[in-house]
């Protein structure tokens, strides 16, 4: 699971609502998986990133190169775009868990895939 994916996921346990974000990330296995640099894609994704959630996830993974916020004029700053490309697309959590901050529900991550399936009792009606 890439950190970009983590940044888009939230818990849909019944009664949680918007407080199910961000999911707390605990990784037991992380891999750096090189991906071709696409600056246009990163430029389009930066405004969609929930920065506080990204910083929290990066902190859990001990990624020190994550800027505290997008820099002014990032669209034209290749160094910044490459850092964000690395953090969002190349850091991959293979094994671990995601935990809902409101309900405490734990979702496993296995072979890079987060299992967000809920039982019938947990789903919203």
UniProtKB/Swiss-Prot annotation:
Record key words, sorted: Cytoplasm, Nucleus, Phosphoprotein
InterPro entries registered for this protein in UniProt: Trm112, Trm112-like
Subcellular location: Nucleus, Nucleoplasm; Cytoplasm, Perinuclear region
GO cellular component, one term: nucleus
Swiss-Prot/TrEMBL GO biological process terms: maturation of LSU-rRNA; maturation of SSU-rRNA; peptidyl-glutamine methylation; positive regulation of rRNA processing; rRNA (guanine-N7)-methylation; rRNA methylation; transcription initiation-coupled chromatin remodeling
Phosphoserine sites (modified residues): 119
Pfam families the record matches: Trm112p (PF03966)
Domain TRM112 residues, every copy: 2-119
UniProt-recorded Gene Ontology molecular function terms: protein heterodimerization activity; tRNA methyltransferase activator activity
Phosphoprotein found in the keyword field: yes
Membrane-crossing segments per the record: none
Family note: Belongs to the TRM112 family.
PANTHER family, sorted: MULTIFUNCTIONAL METHYLTRANSFERASE SUBUNIT TRM112-LIKE PROTEIN, UPF0315 PROTEIN-RELATED
Summary of subunit composition and partner proteins: Part of the heterodimeric BUD23-TRM112 methyltransferase complex; this heterodimerization is necessary for the metabolic stability and activity of the catalytic subunit BUD23. Part of the heterodimeric N6AMT1-TRM112 methyltransferase complex; this heterodimerization is necessary for S-adenosyl-L-methionine-binding to N6AMT1/HEMK2. Part of the heterodimeric ALKBH8-TRM112 methyltransferase complex. Part of the heterodimeric METTL5-TRM112 methyltransferase complex; this heterodimerization is necessary for the stability of the catalytic subunit METTL5.
Function: Acts as an activator of both rRNA/tRNA and protein methyltransferases. Together with methyltransferase BUD23, methylates the N(7) position of a guanine in 18S rRNA. The heterodimer with HEMK2/N6AMT1 catalyzes N5-methylation of ETF1 on 'Gln-185', using S-adenosyl L-methionine as methyl donor. The heterodimer with ALKBH8 catalyzes the methylation of 5-carboxymethyl uridine to 5-methylcarboxymethyl uridine at the wobble position of the anticodon loop in target tRNA species.
Protein name in UniProt: Multifunctional methyltransferase subunit TRM112-like protein
Organism in which the protein naturally occurs: Bos taurus (Bovine)
Chain's gene name: TRMT112
